Amino acid sequence: MSKSWDVIVIGGGHAGCEAAAASARAGARTLLLTHKLETIGEMSCNPAIGGLGKGHLVREIDALDGVMGRMADKAGIQFRMLNRSKGPAVRGPRSQIDRRLYREAMQAELFSTGNLDIIAAAAEDLIVEDGKVAGAVDAAGQAYRAPRVILTTGTFLKGVIHRGEDRIPAGRVGDQPAIGLSDRLYGLGFQMGRLKTGTPARLDGKTIAWDRLESQAADDTPVPFSYLNHRIDVPQIACGVTYTTEETHRIIAERIGESLVYSGRATGVGPRYCPSIEDKVVRFADKTSHQIFLEPEGLDDDTVYPNGISTSVSEETQLLFLRTIPGLEQVEVIRYGYAIEYDYVDPRELYPTLETKRLPGLYLAGQINGTTGYEEAGAQGLVAGLNAALAVQGREPAIFARDEAYIGVMIDDLVTRGVTEPYRMFTSRAEFRLTLRADNADQRLSDRGISLGVVGPVRAAAWTEKKARLDAARAFARSVTLTPNEAVKAGFKVNSDGVRRDVFAMLAYPDVTLDDLGRIWPEVFTWNTDVREQIEIEAAYAGYLDRQRADAESLRKDEDLRLPADLDYAEIGSLSNEVRGKLARVRPLTLGQAARIEGVTPGALTALLAHVRRGRAA
């Protein structure tokens, strides 16, 4: 006997949590199917949320009423704004997270979400009927039916843990891998590959000589992730900082053959920007030390995560090299590090909605798409969950543009270019990063989220009130002006050019502050911190933002030129076989997306455009 839903989400990690929550918020009857209820929201690797680029994604998830930012605010134990001394566009909110608090907060959130059922069962297969997905089957043969299914399997697809000579089939330590789902995807003809990632040993904090370490404190005034929160009530802690030594490197170099990559046993590619300590020793042989952050995993947990030394060497070697590190001479290990290899699906198999092209109704989100990181997974989960719900309701899909959100940048990169290594978000990936700031994600996305039906009433009311305050402040800032003579009399150095200057123009002068202007226009002092920050940023970036808006408008013209879904590229005779093959593989939805496919030349785009226009004229 089977029960039916509108949407089934398989997997309770970060992508699955956001997918289930978004689908339910958008009005779809949703089932979250996960192998263990107690591991929903588990932070399998590092105990942190946010960072450069990643913090932007968390803010965008939050602006669309997702859950990650609010849960991180409930569990954050060391908030820091990265790149604080640099411009607002590249600042990134980050926090160490208490694993238990985060997991408990996420579970409480999901268990209290309307439209959402949660069942503990290991999905083993998909139900496919008439060329479409129709549900899933668990290991016991129980069927769960839905016209939309979202796979958020993380590292579980044929996952294998490597530690020295040990090879252990697992999705993560203590959990069985998902074999049947992987076999089904291969059987359906999906283009798939292997990737790998790694994690360091977990250390017993009671055996660390903390007094010998450098200390990294939290910010004095923590900045929350969620726009709904204005303060952090969780106690804040410091992290320790230490360094590897030449002796550390000697031990690792002597035993490099134990490492997955250097043993020749690796079948998957690892993340370039999160290399193992073995990789660091080999690739940066001239360096005599590497920095390690010792990050407590919780307020009442002695477990410490040594960020910077993920490894796959044997337990014996791990303990040997750990005890050559200052402060860790007497350290005891709670759990040893390991590498894990797993299957992923080439994300060029997906539409920008994250629905698969090969099997209608099936959506993929998270590491199954070749990404790495909680934040990247959560953002994809939200998009997949939202689009699955919209599809069930017969509504237009939600596709986020590159000039609209980092979410749009990431998904466009994935579905257009694919991946050759685990994909991580950086601010440098965005062409419009002055516009796509962490501080204005709600301004970019909350109205759209409301229209899509994925933003609930509490956030909608909070955003509407904030938007009214911002609009009033901007209107006031443009309505009041100073002549050059008035400005000089007030103590400001401006050109005597006869031009009247409003608040924005005055703030463009580096030595003029809002407090200075408040002495002339007291209204300024009534603005709260959020409003003041936005006015200052918009004034500082005014000229640059205008240019980026023009560039974005130019991009939109290409994005607005839709390509037929059934376009036969073989009919375009002037295309090379290579370009024709790439276009057929990706099947871009717009001319803009076609232009971003590697190897597609301007000449090919011209031929493509001419062919489409001829077809429309016929």
UniProtKB/Swiss-Prot annotation:
NAD(+) binds at residues 270-284. Disulfide bonds: none annotated. Its main location: cytoplasm. The keyword Acetylation does not apply. PANTHER family: GLUCOSE INHIBITED DIVISION PROTEIN A, PROTEIN MTO1 HOMOLOG, MITOCHONDRIAL. Homodimer. Heterotetramer of two MnmE and two MnmG subunits. This is tRNA uridine 5-carboxymethylaminomethyl modification enzyme MnmG. It comes from Caulobacter vibrioides (strain NA1000 / CB15N). The gene is mnmG.
